[in-house]
Regions:
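Surface-exposed loop/turn positions
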Residues: 28, 63, 87, 163-164
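Structural core segment of the AMP-binding/adenylate-forming
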Residues: 56-57, 84-159
């Protein structure tokens, strides 16, 4: 019997977490930066709530959502919450310099920029430089949020997971400007 493995994969990356919960929602899904163990149920509930928070802040399907931070529960939840909305997560390191962050923001034209300032002095400095203000997010606490970019044009949304972009990652180096790499849900699932 032949199995088409591609069609058996989750259609969106946030559904990977849902798949993990099928073996037991109370099982550990991950351990955060404070050493707190998150169950699949808690993670799923938080992702759903933060997706609602993003929508309340004006994030639409096809928008780019830039996240400036360190590896943290906030960054993980923001990425999966963007997936729930069919928005593109643009994950960037807070350790990049101001010119690199500005170049990435200028290139990807995000609807909003989110800064995981609570665990990163660098993310907080970047947020302060851009005039971002703290907002409370369900389950992950305060995240600094940049202004709504009303002129941001959303990308087309595709049902096909091979065509729908999940994450836009920028490469950086010592020469040249950062370059964006679009990874689809199929690339990541």
């Amino acid at each position: 019997m032949e199995v088409d493995y591609l069609t058996s994969l989750p259609r969106r990356i946030h559904l990977i977490v849902d798949e993990g919960a099928k073996a037991g929602a109370s099982r550990p899904a991950l351990t955060d930066e404070r050493g707190i163990v998150w169950s699949y149920r808690r993670l799923i509930d938080t992702i759903e709530a933060v997706a609602g928070d993003l929508a309340r802040l004006g994030i639409r399907p096809g928008d780019r959502v830039m996240v400036v931070g360190e590896n943290s529960i906030g960054a993980i939840v923001l990425m999966y919450a963007a997936s729930r909305l069919d928005a593109w997560a643009v994950m960037t390191s807070a350790r990049l310099g101001p010119h690199e962050l500005d170049a990435i923001e200028s290139d990807c034209k995000p609807r909003r920029v989110f800064y995981t300032h609570g665990i990163s002095a660098e993310a907080d400095a970047a947020a302060c430089r851009r005039g971002a203000e703290a907002e409370s997010f369900t389950g992950i606490g305060a995240i600094k949020v940049g202004k709504l970019e009303a002129s941001a044009v959303p990308e087309e949304v595709y049902e096909d997971p091979a065509r729908q972009v999940a994450v836009l990652i920028y490469t950086t180096g010592t020469t040249g400007r950062p370059k964006g790499v679009m990874l689809s849900h199929r690339n990541l699932a």
